[in-house]
Amino acid sequence: MIELFSEIAEVVVLLVLFSTLLIGSYSDIKKREVDRILFLPLMVLALLVNVLLFKLYAISLFSSVLFLCLFFSYNTKLYALITASTIVLGLVAIFIFEPSQMITWSLESLFSLLVLGEILFGVGDIKAIVSVIFSTIFLPFNLLRDSVLIPFSFVFTINLGLVSVAAMFWGFYSLYKLSGTIGMRASAENIKDINPVIFHTFEYRENKYIRYNIPFIEFILFATIITFIGVKFQVPF
Protein backbone atom coordinates (compact mmCIF):
# COMPACT_ATOMS: atom_id res chain seq x y z
CA MET A 1 0.00 0.00 0.00
CA ILE A 2 2.83 2.37 0.91
CA GLU A 3 4.66 1.54 -2.33
CA LEU A 4 1.51 2.25 -4.33
CA PHE A 5 1.05 5.57 -2.56
CA SER A 6 4.70 6.44 -3.25
CA GLU A 7 4.30 5.68 -6.95
CA ILE A 8 1.17 7.83 -7.15
CA ALA A 9 2.95 10.68 -5.36
CA GLU A 10 5.90 10.42 -7.77
CA VAL A 11 3.57 10.63 -10.76
CA VAL A 12 1.81 13.67 -9.28
CA VAL A 13 5.14 15.43 -8.67
CA LEU A 14 6.27 14.75 -12.24
CA LEU A 15 2.96 15.97 -13.67
CA VAL A 16 3.23 19.18 -11.67
CA LEU A 17 6.88 19.52 -12.69
CA PHE A 18 6.24 19.28 -16.42
CA SER A 19 3.08 21.40 -16.21
CA THR A 20 4.99 24.12 -14.37
CA LEU A 21 7.83 24.05 -16.90
CA LEU A 22 5.34 24.24 -19.77
CA ILE A 23 3.64 27.28 -18.21
CA GLY A 24 7.02 28.84 -17.53
CA SER A 25 8.21 28.17 -21.09
CA TYR A 26 5.11 29.78 -22.58
CA SER A 27 5.47 32.84 -20.36
CA ASP A 28 9.20 33.08 -21.08
CA ILE A 29 8.62 32.95 -24.84
CA LYS A 30 5.85 35.56 -24.73
CA LYS A 31 7.20 37.96 -22.10
CA ARG A 32 10.77 36.80 -21.41
CA GLU A 33 9.87 36.52 -17.74
CA VAL A 34 7.91 34.23 -15.43
CA ASP A 35 5.86 34.78 -12.30
CA ARG A 36 8.22 34.93 -9.34
CA ILE A 37 6.18 32.33 -7.40
CA LEU A 38 5.54 29.98 -10.33
CA PHE A 39 7.86 27.25 -9.03
CA LEU A 40 6.86 27.62 -5.36
CA PRO A 41 3.94 25.10 -5.46
CA LEU A 42 6.23 22.52 -7.09
CA MET A 43 8.84 23.02 -4.36
CA VAL A 44 6.22 22.68 -1.61
CA LEU A 45 4.84 19.47 -3.15
CA ALA A 46 8.33 18.03 -3.63
CA LEU A 47 9.18 18.97 -0.03
CA LEU A 48 6.20 17.02 1.31
CA VAL A 49 6.97 13.97 -0.84
CA ASN A 50 10.70 13.94 -0.09
CA VAL A 51 10.15 14.33 3.66
CA LEU A 52 7.07 12.18 4.25
CA LEU A 53 7.75 9.37 1.78
CA PHE A 54 11.51 9.29 1.25
CA LYS A 55 12.63 10.59 4.68
CA LEU A 56 15.11 13.01 3.12
CA TYR A 57 15.19 15.58 5.89
CA ALA A 58 18.54 17.34 5.52
CA ILE A 59 18.54 18.03 1.80
CA SER A 60 14.85 18.93 1.92
CA LEU A 61 15.46 21.53 4.62
CA PHE A 62 18.46 23.16 3.00
CA SER A 63 17.07 22.98 -0.54
CA SER A 64 13.97 24.80 0.65
CA VAL A 65 16.06 27.51 2.32
CA LEU A 66 18.22 27.81 -0.79
CA PHE A 67 15.13 28.23 -2.96
CA LEU A 68 13.64 30.87 -0.64
CA CYS A 69 16.94 32.77 -0.75
CA LEU A 70 16.40 33.29 -4.48
CA PHE A 71 13.54 35.66 -3.67
CA PHE A 72 16.11 38.01 -2.11
CA SER A 73 18.68 37.82 -4.90
CA TYR A 74 18.01 41.49 -5.72
CA ASN A 75 19.97 42.31 -2.54
CA THR A 76 23.34 40.96 -3.66
CA LYS A 77 25.19 41.23 -0.34
CA LEU A 78 22.37 39.73 1.74
CA TYR A 79 21.79 36.97 -0.81
CA ALA A 80 25.49 36.08 -1.01
CA LEU A 81 25.80 35.94 2.79
CA ILE A 82 22.69 33.82 3.45
CA THR A 83 23.28 31.54 0.47
CA ALA A 84 26.94 30.91 1.33
CA SER A 85 25.99 30.11 4.94
CA THR A 86 23.22 27.77 3.79
CA ILE A 87 25.57 25.98 1.38
CA VAL A 88 28.24 25.40 4.03
CA LEU A 89 25.78 24.21 6.69
CA GLY A 90 24.05 22.06 4.09
CA LEU A 91 27.31 20.42 3.02
CA VAL A 92 28.06 19.44 6.62
CA ALA A 93 24.56 18.19 7.45
CA ILE A 94 24.03 16.29 4.20
CA PHE A 95 27.52 14.74 4.37
CA ILE A 96 26.69 13.43 7.85
CA PHE A 97 23.06 12.37 7.46
CA GLU A 98 22.43 11.87 3.72
CA PRO A 99 25.80 11.44 1.95
CA SER A 100 24.12 9.94 -1.12
CA GLN A 101 22.68 13.41 -1.82
CA MET A 102 26.04 15.23 -1.85
CA ILE A 103 26.21 15.49 -5.65
CA THR A 104 22.66 16.79 -5.86
CA TRP A 105 23.28 19.35 -3.11
CA SER A 106 26.54 20.48 -4.72
CA LEU A 107 24.77 21.10 -8.03
CA GLU A 108 21.92 22.99 -6.37
CA SER A 109 24.49 25.12 -4.57
CA LEU A 110 26.45 25.82 -7.75
CA PHE A 111 23.38 26.96 -9.68
CA SER A 112 22.23 29.13 -6.78
CA LEU A 113 25.55 30.98 -6.84
CA LEU A 114 25.30 31.53 -10.60
CA VAL A 115 22.39 33.92 -10.04
CA LEU A 116 24.85 36.52 -8.72
CA GLY A 117 25.11 39.12 -11.43
CA GLU A 118 22.72 37.11 -13.63
CA ILE A 119 25.51 36.65 -16.18
CA LEU A 120 24.56 33.15 -17.33
CA PHE A 121 21.03 32.70 -15.94
CA GLY A 122 18.22 34.88 -14.66
CA VAL A 123 16.55 34.38 -11.28
CA GLY A 124 13.59 32.65 -12.92
CA ASP A 125 15.92 30.23 -14.70
CA ILE A 126 17.71 29.35 -11.46
CA LYS A 127 14.40 28.80 -9.64
CA ALA A 128 13.39 26.45 -12.44
CA ILE A 129 16.68 24.54 -12.31
CA VAL A 130 16.70 24.19 -8.51
CA SER A 131 13.06 23.05 -8.46
CA VAL A 132 13.76 20.45 -11.18
CA ILE A 133 16.74 19.06 -9.26
CA PHE A 134 14.90 18.98 -5.93
CA SER A 135 11.68 17.47 -7.28
CA THR A 136 13.50 14.60 -9.04
CA ILE A 137 15.65 13.35 -6.15
CA PHE A 138 13.71 10.08 -6.15
CA LEU A 139 14.71 9.31 -9.77
CA PRO A 140 18.15 7.63 -9.69
CA PHE A 141 19.92 6.83 -12.94
CA ASN A 142 20.87 3.12 -13.06
CA LEU A 143 23.85 2.06 -15.14
CA LEU A 144 25.94 -1.08 -15.56
CA ARG A 145 23.17 -3.51 -14.68
CA ASP A 146 22.07 -1.57 -11.63
CA SER A 147 25.55 -1.65 -10.07
CA VAL A 148 26.04 2.10 -10.39
CA LEU A 149 23.56 4.76 -9.32
CA ILE A 150 23.97 8.24 -10.78
CA PRO A 151 21.70 11.03 -9.49
CA PHE A 152 19.13 12.42 -11.90
CA SER A 153 20.56 15.85 -11.11
CA PHE A 154 23.99 14.94 -12.51
CA VAL A 155 22.67 13.70 -15.85
CA PHE A 156 20.24 16.63 -15.98
CA THR A 157 23.14 19.06 -15.56
CA ILE A 158 25.03 17.43 -18.43
CA ASN A 159 21.96 17.64 -20.65
CA LEU A 160 21.40 21.22 -19.55
CA GLY A 161 24.90 22.02 -20.73
CA LEU A 162 24.17 20.46 -24.11
CA VAL A 163 20.90 22.34 -24.62
CA SER A 164 22.64 25.53 -23.46
CA VAL A 165 24.90 25.22 -26.50
CA ALA A 166 21.79 24.83 -28.66
CA ALA A 167 20.27 27.89 -26.96
CA MET A 168 23.41 29.89 -27.71
CA PHE A 169 23.28 28.99 -31.41
CA TRP A 170 19.57 29.83 -31.47
CA GLY A 171 20.49 33.24 -30.07
CA PHE A 172 23.12 33.67 -32.80
CA TYR A 173 20.61 32.74 -35.47
CA SER A 174 17.87 35.04 -34.15
CA LEU A 175 20.26 37.98 -33.95
CA TYR A 176 21.62 37.24 -37.42
CA LYS A 177 18.11 37.23 -38.90
CA LEU A 178 17.47 40.73 -37.59
CA SER A 179 20.86 42.38 -38.02
CA GLY A 180 22.94 40.25 -40.36
CA THR A 181 25.59 40.08 -37.63
CA ILE A 182 26.96 36.81 -36.30
CA GLY A 183 27.65 36.92 -32.57
CA MET A 184 26.09 37.67 -29.19
CA ARG A 185 25.48 41.35 -29.91
CA ALA A 186 24.93 43.62 -32.89
CA SER A 187 24.88 47.35 -33.52
CA ALA A 188 21.39 48.81 -33.16
CA GLU A 189 22.11 52.01 -35.08
CA ASN A 190 20.53 51.01 -38.40
CA ILE A 191 17.88 48.60 -37.14
CA LYS A 192 14.25 49.66 -36.94
CA ASP A 193 11.31 48.10 -35.12
CA ILE A 194 13.33 46.35 -32.42
CA ASN A 195 11.04 44.26 -30.22
CA PRO A 196 12.04 45.25 -26.65
CA VAL A 197 10.79 41.93 -25.30
CA ILE A 198 12.77 39.72 -27.64
CA PHE A 199 15.86 41.92 -27.92
CA HIS A 200 17.67 43.75 -25.15
CA THR A 201 19.10 47.15 -26.06
CA PHE A 202 22.14 48.45 -24.21
CA GLU A 203 24.97 50.93 -24.58
CA TYR A 204 28.66 50.09 -24.64
CA ARG A 205 31.39 52.68 -25.18
CA GLU A 206 28.84 55.24 -26.35
CA ASN A 207 27.45 52.87 -28.98
CA LYS A 208 24.01 51.24 -28.90
CA TYR A 209 23.78 47.46 -29.25
CA ILE A 210 21.13 44.76 -29.13
CA ARG A 211 21.26 41.26 -27.72
CA TYR A 212 18.77 38.43 -28.16
CA ASN A 213 16.92 37.49 -24.98
CA ILE A 214 16.96 33.70 -24.94
CA PRO A 215 13.80 32.16 -23.41
CA PHE A 216 15.90 29.69 -21.47
CA ILE A 217 13.17 27.95 -19.47
CA GLU A 218 12.04 26.12 -22.59
CA PHE A 219 15.57 24.73 -22.89
CA ILE A 220 15.40 23.68 -19.22
CA LEU A 221 12.20 21.84 -20.18
CA PHE A 222 14.01 20.12 -23.06
CA ALA A 223 16.85 19.04 -20.76
CA THR A 224 14.35 17.67 -18.23
CA ILE A 225 12.48 15.69 -20.89
CA ILE A 226 15.69 14.24 -22.32
CA THR A 227 16.91 13.22 -18.87
CA PHE A 228 13.54 11.74 -17.92
CA ILE A 229 13.51 9.63 -21.09
CA GLY A 230 17.01 8.47 -20.22
CA VAL A 231 15.86 7.45 -16.73
CA LYS A 232 12.86 5.51 -18.00
CA PHE A 233 14.80 3.68 -20.71
CA GLN A 234 18.16 3.66 -18.91
CA VAL A 235 19.91 5.48 -21.74
CA PRO A 236 22.74 7.70 -20.46
CA PHE A 237 22.19 10.78 -22.61
Task: List the predicted regions and their residue ranges.
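A membrane-topology feature that recognizes alpha-helical transmembrane segments
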Residues: 1-237
